[in-house]
Amino acid sequence: MLLVIDVGNTNIVLGIYDGERLVRDWRVSTDKARTTDEYGILINELFRLAGLGLDQIRAVIISSVVPPLTGVLERLSLGYFGMRPLVVGPGIKTGMPIQYDNPREVGADRIVNAVAGYEKYRTSLIIVDFGTATTFDYVNRKGEYCGGAIAPGLVISTEALFQRASKLPRVDIIRPSAIIARNTVNSMQAGIYYGYVGLVDEIVTRMKAESKDAPRVIATGGLASLIAPESKTIEAVEEYLTLEGLRILYERNRE
């Protein structure tokens, strides 16, 4: 079986594939202070609770936007699974031309999503990934990664409001029932939620116009299912897009 690891700034998502089938997945908090052994103990316990053994893993692939943790997880793969992992980065075979001023600047997760999205839909795409930052990526009909936009994520935006405005509390991110709210908490939730829906739809609309195409719009990431119902532009939510992209990249780079 294949272990895929997606390291984000807020969460680490792990998945186990048996062939093309996702057998199990987990989401844990990203903690740059954790050691290799601490992550090893955590993963061992997750496997144990799922009735899986570390010896069932035959390969590991890692995508990371947190450089300090890349080495930690590489050592984990060597120490706990007895194998060197494939790490998404320069030199990896993606099968996708990257039309970026400096291809090395593109986050690994953005390329992984683009590969998975194009593999499934085989047409031009805008991929919206709701992570610590929200990314908007355009893939053209030829399967070329053309770039995109990056905006502050929902959680970052909400925390900034709490931290920088003395009288405003920390609030949960929810889909509110009304835009004209009658208390401070609900007013913040309405502004955050519907303001973010507007941000997403405006960026996507402008990207569509600039591309001079009619790309399909898909969303992924932890908060995609929260925003998508109110969005006028998001057509589908692909919950496991990044994990699926890692599986595809592993297959393309097998020796």
Curated annotation (Swiss-Prot):
Its cofactor is NH4(+); K(+). The keyword Transferase applies. ATP binds at D6, V7, G8, N9, T10, N11, I12, V13, T132. It catalyses: (R)-pantothenate + ATP = (R)-4'-phosphopantothenate + ADP + H(+). GO terms for cellular component: cytoplasm. GO terms for molecular function: ATP binding; metal ion binding; pantothenate kinase activity. Substrate binds at Y100, G107, A108, D109, R110, T184. A monovalent cation. Ammonium or potassium. It comes from Geobacter sulfurreducens (strain ATCC 51573 / DSM 12127 / PCA). This is Type III pantothenate kinase.
